[in-house]
Amino acid sequence: MSRRAVQDGRRRLYELAVSQGGYFTAAQARAAGYPKQLQYYHARRGNWVREDRGIYRLWEWPRSGYDDLVLWTLWTGGVAVVSHQSAMAVHDISDLMPAKIHLTVPPGFRKKPPPVIVLHRDLLPPQDVEQHEGFRVTTPLRALVDAARVAVDVERLSDGIRDAIRKGLLADRHIEEAIGTLQGEAAELLGQALMEARRSL
């Protein structure tokens, strides 16, 4: 491999890692020109930190509070979107601190999740997804709707709605419109949460 090819591969991998919070997969490294032996070499030398099977982090890249979300998104092959209660935590709406990481994956996703992950299967429309630092996350509105669908308690939902409105992330009319798309318990729960949120605004 020429010196130019090595430099190009290093640049491609670095740019990719930067877009993913300093992380990358073995498959991504291979596509950038790093065969398995070279990957082992960089891991042994400490240039790359092995975070999980087939997932590395650049040693010089600082850790952040979102490392686990980047890591588990990569574990899905990059198809997951951080969602539900985990998305609420990312947007800092309510003081909800979920014990598990909630990810939405396409219906055909078959990988078995570890105990720390809760998978939800759905096809998310592009308008319900935002790019964050190294991972994708559902919008505040979609996060609240999804949380209502899995019956997060009304107090947490109310806190989430109130915080989202105060931060200018959405207006209460958006919640009203979302309630109209829901049925049964989820619609009732979100409606009750909106009424409670309005009392504290």
Put a short name on every predicted segment.
Residues S2-L201:
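Short gly/ser-rich loop at a beta-strand->alpha-helix junction or flexible surface loop bordering the NTP-binding
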